[in-house]
UniProtKB/Swiss-Prot annotation:
It is a single-pass type II membrane protein. Coiled coil: none annotated. This is Alpha-1,3-mannosyltransferase CMT1. The gene is CMT1. The chain crosses the membrane at residues 34-54. The keyword Cell inner membrane does not apply. Its cofactor is Mg(2+); Mn(2+); Co(2+). It comes from Cryptococcus neoformans var. neoformans serotype D (strain JEC21 / ATCC MYA-565) (Filobasidiella neoformans). It is found in: Golgi apparatus membrane.
Amino acid sequence: MFRNTLRTFPRPATPSLPTSSHSPIARASLSKSPLFVLSLVLVCIFFLSFLSHPDPSARKLQWPGLFPSPSPSVIHTKDLFLERALNATSEAFREICPSAGDPVHLDPDLTEAQKKRYLPLKRSKRGRYLLVTNTRQIEAHLPDLLNTLIVLLRYLAPEHLAVSILEGPSSDCTQKAIEQVLKPMLDDQGLESAWTRIETGESKIDWGKHNRIEKIAELRNTALAPLWQGEGDQKWEDEIEAVVFFNDVYLHAADILELVYQHVKNGAGITTAMDWWKKRPEYYYDVWVGRTIDTGDLFYPIDNPWWSPSSDLFPNSPNSRNAYSRLEPFQVFSSWNALAVLSPKPFLPPHNVRFRRGDVEKGECAASECTLIATDFWKAGFGKVAVVPSVQLAYERDVAKDIIEDVGKQKEQLGWIDGVPPEHLDDKIEWSTKPPKKVRCHPWPEVNGLSANVWEETRWVQPWLE
């Protein structure tokens, strides 16, 4: 549509100058005229706007375009059924969110090698993988999320999935897109309503009245509640194979499948990706949550009361550092990193683990709700926590593109082919059954509000309270 529209606009005629202006004296006089300068500026702006096609989802200063951005390209796959579903959903999404950008992942499908690798996840004896998220304001992320869900439904089949989404509040098109595009798409792809719970339009939170960790834990528990509550008359707890909890990041189906594959293969309690705030230079995002298995230290120890670049990860954990450099899964004490696969068993009787804030009255350090989940998994006997560094995620579009490029090059150098690692980099994790003797903690201040500086205080504490 854009190309046809573009041809209907006449190219602006170049204004002719008076004949006398060709003389050096006339040109000098004219160049000093305010009207001439203004005209020149306007012509430059016009041509810059003519050439510019800003990306609405990119969070950076961009030159405004004269015309709308080009329509997204049609997705082509070998699977025609998948191709139709992807393109039909994309078209429906564009009608709801016309200003949204394209997906970051231009090819949402799996490679043939990946399809072969993940076959064990779709065997008939397998249960369902419960996809869970708390989300808001994700217009930019929705194209990739929609594609991811469609590919997972097509590859795993609807009988192997369940979905729980808690949204809001959003001021962009997120709520409308979830209600009018995502939910109908799940129905069209065969996921029964008994295996979906989608709640939108959550009220705005007055953070001045809430402890951040306590409130976020409450929201996570609400999103996860169908695991133990079910939906309608349908019980979920007996059929959920694994919980896949994700944040507002740019996803690809292979990200989720690789994490679930490693989780099942290694018999883990929690398996996570890596997430980044920035990639150039590197700022590891979930630094407040992650702890190493050997020393209990941060993945990137911060010695100053502020966040600093983290290109030198795991300086105090040689085994973790070596595995990370080779993109091999490795054990940690705790991690979340935007995408976490969790065993459902600790959330169910007799353990009944929940996201929570620290019990300060008992002397427990006020850690993140995600650190405390790992702590409670350890305590319940599910302390096999792993990071899969080949899956790296970003919250910002530009960072996601940097990751795709940088990790893609690293995988190529390491011998990955079609998204699958070489055999010598695909061993099982050798688990330690013991946690670190002490774990580093930066307590959240006992004040209400959304933000605080946790780096001002450092404690070394027992892995968990008895």
